Curated annotation (Swiss-Prot):
Species assigned in the record: Bos taurus (Bovine)
Pfam family, one: NUDIX
Residues that bear N6-acetyllysine: 176
Catalytic activity: isopentenyl diphosphate = dimethylallyl diphosphate
Name assigned to this protein: Isopentenyl-diphosphate Delta-isomerase 1
Similarity section: Belongs to the IPP isomerase type 1 family.
Function: Catalyzes the 1,3-allylic rearrangement of the homoallylic substrate isopentenyl (IPP) to its highly electrophilic allylic isomer, dimethylallyl diphosphate (DMAPP).
Co-factor binding details: Binds 1 Mg(2+) ion per subunit.
Record's GO cellular component terms: cytoplasm; peroxisome
Entry EC no(s): 5.3.3.2
Pathways involved: Isoprenoid biosynthesis; dimethylallyl diphosphate biosynthesis; dimethylallyl diphosphate from isopentenyl diphosphate: step 1/1
Length: 227
């Protein structure tokens, strides 16, 4: 694996780069494990390194979507606006368990607490709805990027928030119209949004949003959408 200096990066975020992500093939079959750092180096991504991830979309009971702005300390896509929570299940027994994506949903519960301070009892895995998966690749800069099989998870619930400033610069609940305005600002270069959030907003998000009480219509655990 290539050696890249992390001396100028945020110390806490560098520590997280030692976490072990789950390596998968293009059909999401587990083939091993690798550090978060190595999974996010463009040099490895160009060789085909692919890992498992998830994206949470949390709506409150007013049907507003919780967005976050990633902190400037983040190594990939710092300062970008994105969906509620985006991270990775780890290569450990609890989060490797694949039946009904329970391992991924446990990882989502863990990261909702770590990033947004949401008490774990407020988002039990059984209330995190697994819809489908997308496969995408994106560069953050010349060194870092993403190449993921991304599990799409939806939650509809009012939650308690206490964000970690090392993870999150700001957050807000938005209506559909407010999100469209935000996407417009990104198109004009006024703000930045993450590529996976842009992809999902351009394809599926508004259809899901219109049917939050009928999400079963959109459950597809067989297909991996190639983006």
């Amino acid at each position: 694996m290539p050696e890249v200096s992390t001396d100028d990066l945020d110390e806490r975020q560098v520590q997280l780069m030692a976490e072990m992500c789950i390596l998968v093939d293009e059909n999401d079959r587990r083939i091993g494990a690798e550090t978060k750092k190595n999974c996010h180096l463009n040099e490895n991504i160009e060789r085909g390194l692919l890992h498992r991830a998830f994206s949470v979309f949390l709506f409150n009971t007013e049907n507003k979507l919780l967005l976050q702005q990633r902190s400037d300390a983040k190594i990939t896509f710092p300062g970008c606006f994105t969906n509620t929570c985006c991270s990775h299940p780890l290569s450990n027994p609890s989060e490797l368990e694949e039946n009904d994506a329970i391992g991924v949903r446990r990882a989502a519960q863990r990261r909702l607490k770590a990033e947004l301070g949401i008490p774990m009892e407020e988002v039990p895995p059984e209330e995190i709805n697994y819809l489908t998966r997308i496969h995408y690749k994106a560069q953050s800069d010349s060194i870092w990027g993403e190449h993921e099989i991304d599990y799409i998870l939806l939650v509809k619930k009012n939650v308690t928030l206490n964000p970690d400033p090392n993870e999150i610069k700001s957050y807000c609940y938005v209506t559909k119209e407010e999100l469209e305005e935000l996407i417009g600002k990104a198109a004009h270069g006024e703000i930045k949004i993450t590529p996976w959030f842009q992809i999902i907003a351009d394809t599926f998000l508004f259809k899901w949003w219109d049917n939050l009480n009928r999400l079963n219509l959109f459950v597809d655990h067989e297909k991996i959408h190639r983006m």
